[in-house]
């Protein structure tokens, strides 16, 4: 990844960074909740973004 990024790339990376976090604990506490963890987590070394 170059140090000079276009705004579109930067915005794309920012979105992916926001998506890559665990679910909040209070969501797990909700009644009838079946979500245990965020299945779409991405590790920076294992899975690349295909950029």
UniProtKB/Swiss-Prot annotation:
UniProt keyword Ribonucleoprotein present: yes
GO MF annotations, alphabetized: RNA binding; structural constituent of ribosome
Main location: cytoplasm
This protein's record includes keyword Lipid metabolism: no
PROSITE patterns: RIBOSOMAL_L39E
Location(s) in or outside the cell: Cytoplasm
Record's GO cellular component terms: cytosol; cytosolic large ribosomal subunit; cytosolic ribosome; extracellular space
SUPFAM superfamilies in the record: Ribosomal protein L39e
A Pfam family assignment: Ribosomal_L39
Family to which the UniProt record says this protein belongs: Belongs to the eukaryotic ribosomal protein eL39 family.
Function (record text): RNA-binding component of the large ribosomal subunit. The ribosome is a large ribonucleoprotein complex responsible for the synthesis of proteins in the cell.
Name recorded for this polypeptide: Large ribosomal subunit protein eL39
Organism: Homo sapiens (Human)
Lineage, opening ranks: Eukaryota, Metazoa, Chordata, Craniata, Vertebrata
């Amino acid at each position: 990844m170059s140090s000079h990024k276009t705004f579109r790339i930067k915005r794309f990376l920012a979105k992916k960074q926001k998506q890559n976090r665990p679910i909040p604990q209070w969501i797990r506490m909700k009644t009838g909740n079946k979500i245990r963890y965020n299945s779409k987590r991405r590790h920076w070394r294992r899975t690349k973004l295909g950029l």
